[in-house]
Amino acid sequence: MVIDPELGIDIVNLGLVYKVNVDDEGVCTVDMTLTSMGCPMGPQIIDQVKTVLAEIPEIQDTEVNIVWSPPWTKDMMSRYAKIALGVS
């Protein structure tokens, strides 16, 4: 699980992960976004994603693509994340 260090919620519940694919060679491609283009924790979050996925034996390599479309909004958060952060 990768926790956003600024918000304290995992990136899946925050709605930051858009797509995950693993090909036949075990290469995992993750399309994800950040809460803002200037997010100072972006490189740290990407490193954490790669570290967590490297623990899965079937994953041989990981590519993390930061995408800005669609733009992230609080509406993408799970109910859990909204409650935890006090967002309605």
Swiss-Prot record:
<comment type="similarity">
    <text>Belongs to the MIP18 family.</text>
</comment>
<dbReference type="InterPro" id="IPR034904">
    <property type="entry name" value="FSCA_dom_sf"/>
</dbReference>
<dbReference type="InterPro" id="IPR002744">
    <property type="entry name" value="MIP18-like"/>
</dbReference>
<comment type="function">
    <text>Involved in the maturation of iron-sulfur (Fe-S) proteins. May function as a Fe-S cluster carrier. Is required for S.aureus growth under conditions that impose a high demand for lipoic acid, likely via a role in the maturation of the lipoate synthase LipA. Is non-essential for growth in conditions that impose a low demand for lipoic acid or Fe-S clusters, such as fermentative growth. Also seems to be involved in the maturation of AcnA, LeuCD and IlvD proteins, that utilize Fe-S cluster cofactors, and its role increases under conditions of high-demand for Fe-S clusters (respiratory growth).</text>
</comment>
<protein>
    <recommendedName>
        <fullName>Fe-S protein maturation auxiliary factor SufT</fullName>
    </recommendedName>
</protein>
<dbReference type="Pfam" id="PF01883">
    <property type="entry name" value="FeS_assembly_P"/>
</dbReference>
<dbReference type="InterPro" id="IPR052339">
    <property type="entry name" value="Fe-S_Maturation_MIP18"/>
</dbReference>
